[in-house]
């Protein structure tokens, strides 16, 4: 029998529902249960693909090409189970599907309403394809009281009535703020949040209380009394130094036991969290450290690069070192010399992105890394900027650029539908909307067996996730390779470049894909493990 755990949030946003859900899933996995995770996003966008990274954070891409919420990255990293398009849905996508059905006449002339049509669509999504799982954890985005979230709360309320008795559990994540002048944790915001939740028909079974100190017994009793839960169901979610300590913290607090008890399941043997303890110990007690610059355009919101920062942490864990990140806005390098910012650092990473803003700064960062022989990892846009830098500085093409920024005499980077045929720019197909030419999801690549990147992977065949609409122009391959920029990886048909590297440089690699999306704390991605290793070697030269 499949059991459902619905995770909601209250009091304030950004409490970490995604991490809480992923951590609970990890502990249940450690007990031997099969767990699936899903995310319901109340916003009206069809998906986050065209949303600003500075508002929404990163777009997490799945193997099947879905552009999803960054929380799915937490799910994958904590459980090791690849997510898919079937694990994330938005209000926008639900309305899009319902309106399409209405236009086709599928509803036979019925009046389309939020209840039952929208709520039924949400329930169908939650219940689909779960027969092989013991637990399905469903996170509802936003905060209780948000008007756009009401259809989702109504849908999970209905599921609580429609599913067999004892197969649903509602976990409510709230904040217990500490007021220094009063010298105590305040429970009133949580009481009001639960009151709001109960007003729409949902009685939480477990309170997961985010706090910076242990909850005194008096406050526990008060929360249990006024929120109508057992005292044992008031679980403290203490702040911890690393997100990889959260499963250990929840296990200590008894969250997994309370969930199992709610479903009438035996606790059985204690879960084996040995690997989580190893990870937490390595994060707490590194044997060294390196400093790596991230030269990006969305550095104002670190969540815009969430998978990237976690992948670097994984690389550090594998070497037992702490990775210190120096965030640098790429536009700064368009006005100032990069040297004062980059001197003394052990590696430079230029991540993915779109648009001309900051592009020249990223090109200057790539040049600095090449000339100073500092380890460089260029991801997606970062690879393209490294190719433009090589074309300008080494191959005698001072006007080399990307057609993303406008017409250019040397389009070394172009739209996937634009390629140079002779001296003419050929357009294979008319450009559509912003998503029309995007290359999304997992694609295979073959690596040059003599290349550094093939040695890093230990394989000549790889599969990685992509998210881009511009590509390095293969018409320039011969000229660039003559100057030492090896096209070390290509698509299986040989038509699209996937990786480049500077021959003779200690560690300078560009990849068109996003390796950070497949890195796990227990299985660091080879590129990030190699990059951090190269940074360690460079640190010994400083």
UniProtKB/Swiss-Prot annotation:
Region (Amidoligase domain): 1-265
Family: Belongs to the CTP synthase family.
Gene: pyrG
Record-annotated active site: 380 (nucleophile), 514, 516
Protein name as annotated: CTP synthase
Binding site for Mg(2+): 71, 139
Residues holding CTP: 13, 146-148, 186-191, 222
Species of provenance: Methylobacterium radiotolerans (strain ATCC 27329 / DSM 1819 / JCM 2831 / NBRC 15690 / NCIMB 10815 / 0-1)
Keyword list, A-Z: ATP-binding, Glutamine amidotransferase, Ligase, Magnesium, Metal-binding, Nucleotide-binding, Pyrimidine biosynthesis
Functional pathway: Pyrimidine metabolism; CTP biosynthesis via de novo pathway; CTP from UDP: step 2/2
Assembly description: Homotetramer.
Pfam family, one: CTP_synth_N
């Amino acid at each position: 029998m499949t059991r459902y755990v619905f995770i909601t949030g209250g009091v304030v946003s950004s409490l970490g529902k995604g991490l809480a859900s992923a951590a609970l899933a990890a502990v249940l996995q450690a007990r031997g249960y099969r767990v699936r995770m899903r995310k319901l996003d109340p916003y009206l966008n069809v998906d986050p693909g065209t949303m600003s990274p500075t508002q929404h954070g990163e777009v997490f891409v799945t193997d099947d090409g879905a552009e999803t919420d960054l929380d799915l990255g937490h799910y994958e990293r904590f459980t090791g189970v690849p997510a898919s398009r079937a694990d994330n849905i938005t209000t926008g996508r639900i309305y899009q599907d319902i309106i399409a059905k209405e236009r086709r006449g599928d509803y036979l002339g019925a009046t389309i309403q939020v209840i039952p049509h929208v709520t039924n669509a949400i329930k169908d999504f939650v219940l689909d394809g779960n027969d092989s799982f013991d637990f399905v954890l469903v996170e509802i985005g936003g905060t209780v009281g948000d008007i756009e979230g009401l259809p989702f709360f109504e849908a999970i309320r209905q599921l609580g009535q429609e599913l067999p008795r004892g197969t649903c559990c509602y976990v409510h994540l709230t904040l217990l703020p500490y007021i220094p002048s009063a010298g105590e944790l305040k429970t009133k915001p949580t009481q009001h949040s639960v009151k709001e939740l109960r007003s729409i028909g949902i009685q939480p079974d477990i309170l997961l209380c985010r706090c910076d100190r242990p909850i005194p017994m008096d406050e526990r009793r008060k929360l249990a009394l006024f929120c109508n839960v057992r005292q044992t169901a008031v679980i403290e979610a203490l702040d911890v130094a690393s997100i990889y300590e959260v499963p250990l913290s929840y296990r200590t607090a008894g969250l997994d036991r309370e969930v199992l008890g709610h479903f009438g399941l035996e606790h059985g043997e204690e879960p084996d969290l040995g690997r989580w303890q190893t990870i937490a110990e390595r994060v707490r007690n590194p044997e060294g450290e390196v400093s790596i610059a991230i030269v990006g355009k969305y550095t104002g919101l670190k969540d815009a690069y969430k998978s990237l920062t976690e992948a670097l942490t994984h690389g550090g864990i594998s070497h037992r070192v702490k990775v210190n990140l120096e965030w640098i806005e790429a536009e700064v390098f368009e006005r100032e010399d990069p040297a004062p910012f980059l001197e003394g650092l052990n590696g430079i990473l230029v991540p993915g992105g779109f648009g001309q803003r900051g592009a020249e700064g990223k090109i200057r960062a790539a040049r600095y890394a090449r000339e100073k022989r500092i380890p460089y990892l260029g991801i997606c846009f970062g690879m393209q900027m490294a190719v433009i830098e090589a074309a300008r500085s080494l191959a005698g093409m001072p006007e080399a650029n990307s057609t993303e920024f406008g017409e250019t005499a040397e389009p070394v980077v172009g739209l996937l539908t634009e390629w140079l045929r002779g001296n003419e720019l050929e357009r294979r197909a008319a450009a559509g909307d912003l998503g029309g030419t995007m290359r999304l999801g997992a694609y295979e690549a073959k690596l040059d067996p003599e290349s550094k990147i093939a040695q890093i992977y230990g394989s000549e065949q790889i599969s990685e996730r992509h998210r881009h609409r511009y590509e390095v122009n293969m018409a320039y391959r011969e000229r660039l390779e003559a100057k030492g920029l090896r096209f070390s990886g290509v698509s299986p048909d040989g038509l699209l470049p996937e990786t480049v590297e500077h021959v003779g440089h200690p560690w300078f690699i560009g990849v068109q894909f996003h390796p950070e999306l497949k890195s796990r704390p227990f299985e660091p991605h080879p590129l990030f493990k190699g990059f951090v290793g190269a940074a360690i070697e460079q640190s010994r030269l400083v």
